[in-house]
């Protein structure tokens, strides 16, 4: 505790412990600068070599307060539990109070081998660093985008399984999630419509960009119903489903969005989803898709 750190026995024990462990370099917070002379005197009294000290600036929550778990600030374990990748957290922490130099000066994303290669104490700042959650989020999103599809699915599946218990095409879902995902822990809230259709207002079908209204949405879904009911249509082939819907839009003289925007609402009850209407249809499969389209038409009939 802080009480013991103020006692001579703490400094004494610290010096003895470090010496017995063969410590040659000590990296610690700048708040220990004032106690360094005491440590040095003890080393000299014992006739031991004084280690090399590197004092780092504190990490601040804001301009006045230090980041502290005692005050409820997130620890590494908390961040990982929320769905941040270990590599992203490590990358961001390395940039707190330290900056790369030379050819790496403008680079922000580093692999662990790169950090081992380029890190040097000369890049340590003398000024405190402020923990920026948005910056960490951006770095985490970049790490997620750089994962292979297989790696992303492996990391995302526990979060998907916690939210979706019905049969879905996980591979297609992950292909749509990966470019949109910033933090793995936010995946479940994006998927809550798969197991149960949420309540929604038909005004959600109105979209100026897609030129849709609740009235045109009913027309669009009625036009799509026979297309999606065709037994020859393979819901395991996303391109085939999209092409079939696109052909219907061309037949009606409409833009794709005029048909597909209402389809997305009918299947999810949401305006923002991990994928467009045909993506959702393929993830859910024919049976669920047809049931929800029919329910949407009935809802629009009022």
Task: Locate the predicted segments by residue.
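Short, small-residue-biased leader/transition segments that mark boundaries at the very start
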Residues: 2-4
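Short alpha-helical scaffolding segments that buttress acidic/His motifs in well-ordered protein cores
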Residues: 92-93, 119, 140, 174-181, ...
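Conserved phosphate-binding loops in nucleotide/dinucleotide-binding enzymes
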Residues: 7, 21-32, 60-92, 96-104, ...
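Short conserved beta-strand segments at catalytic cores or DNA/RNA-binding microdomains
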Residues: 8-20
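Charged substrate- and nucleic-acid-binding regions of tRNA-handling and nucleotidyl-transfer enzymes
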Residues: 235, 239-301
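Small-residue-rich helix-loop
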Residues: 149-252
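Extended active-site and interfacial segments that coordinate phosphate-rich ligands
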Residues: 19-47
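Structural motif
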Residues: 79-87, 126-132, 164-173, 250-258
């Amino acid at each position: 505790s802080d009480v013991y750190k103020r006692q001579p026995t703490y400094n004494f024990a610290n010096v003895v412990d470090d010496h017995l462990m063969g410590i040659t370099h000590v990296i610690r917070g700048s708040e220990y600068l004032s106690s360094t002379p005491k440590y040095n005197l003890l080393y000299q009294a014992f006739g031991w070599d004084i280690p090399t000290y590197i004092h780092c600036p504190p990490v601040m929550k804001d301009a006045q307060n230090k980041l502290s778990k005692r005050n409820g600030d997130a620890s590494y374990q908390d961040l990982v539990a929320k769905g941040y990748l270990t590599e992203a957290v490590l990358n961001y922490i390395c940039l707190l109070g330290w900056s790369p130099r030379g050819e790496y000066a403008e680079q922000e994303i580093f692999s662990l081998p790169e950090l081992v290669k380029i890190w040097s104490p000369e890049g340590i700042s003398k000024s405190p660093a402020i923990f920026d959650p948005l910056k960490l989020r951006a770095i985490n999103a970049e790490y997620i985008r750089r994962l292979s599809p297989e790696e992303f699915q492996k990391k995302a599946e526990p979060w998907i399984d916690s939210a979706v218990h019905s049969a879905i095409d996980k591979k297609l879902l992950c292909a749509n999630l990966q470019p949109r995902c910033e933090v793995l822990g936010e995946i479940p809230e994006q998927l809550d419509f798969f197991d149960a259709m949420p309540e929604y207002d038909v005004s959600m079908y109105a979209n100026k960009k897609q030129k849709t209204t609740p009235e045109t949405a009913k027309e669009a879904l009625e036009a799509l119903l026979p297309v999606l009911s065709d037994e020859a249509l393979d819901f395991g082939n996303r391109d085939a489903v999209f092409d079939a819907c696109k052909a219907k839009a061309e037949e009606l003289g409409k833009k794709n969005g005029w048909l597909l925007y209402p389809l997305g609402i009918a299947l999810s009850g949401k305006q923002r989803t991990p994928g467009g209407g045909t993506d959702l249809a393929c993830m859910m499969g024919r049976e669920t898709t047809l049931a929800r389209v029919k329910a949407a038409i009935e809802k629009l009939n009022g």
